[in-house]
């Protein structure tokens, strides 16, 4: 194992390994753990949940033993975890890991968390439980595509980048418009114009992005992985969550890709084949959103995740001195 890279004391290194779902982030991260004393900080809004292992592709017990991992299995599925909580946790962990003489390795694909950490949190209105309940009721009566059409009337920019069934994001955009009287896209644009960022531009961040040279090949990989999850007992996992009695499809945990589709299957809203198709399609949509976020990250160094030597390329870019 090599020593920690020699960066300026003012800029101790933080390596970020970003990529869409099924891009091979775990394998690359574990390879980096063989090169330097890293501690892995999960950048994944689904891995925070306990009792959700198969559908989140959570690292195995053996993989978790290779290096210290953080922000995995930290909250109950009945609870929520925000970008603000992630930033607070990640900043604390980065300091603690550096104090131990180790390298923080941030690994994942929840780009909202990455942007919040490196660019700061936005000042959008806080969630309003009563308004969300009202929107949920409206969606139950008319369907999320109808609410997507409503959003298109007041915030066409945001609506254009959201799928008609992207319930969580449609709800948030409508909520922001109702509370502020302004489109979310306009608020975000103004904040971006007035903000000066120190985060990702800081020399301490080494940002490596795993991106596919062939989107179709990654789509095939996503389908194979979803089928493997089903074979491993994904449906049984969701059945156990349902049996608790305190969870429902409106929770962020159950809105995670794959879980919502299996929940609908268990509710009798879809047959097995339809559930499988919807789960794969939702995962591909997630992948598309992740890649869109990544490509708006100019500080990244890109590695083709389909290349046979992609792990070696990641190791070279991480620059641990080997």
Curated annotation (Swiss-Prot):
| SUPFAM superfamilies for the chain | P-loop containing nucleoside triphosphate hydrolases
Region Interaction with substrate tRNA: list its residue ranges. Answer: 44-47, 168-172, 255-260
Which InterPro entries does the record cross-reference, listed alphabetically?
Dimethylallyltransferase, IPT, P-loop_NTPase
Q: Which residues bind substrate?
A: 21-26
Q: Describe the reaction catalysed, as an equation.
A: adenosine(37) in tRNA + dimethylallyl diphosphate = N(6)-dimethylallyladenosine(37) in tRNA + diphosphate
The main enzyme category here is transferase
Tell me what this protein is called. tRNA dimethylallyltransferase
> Gene name on record?
miaA
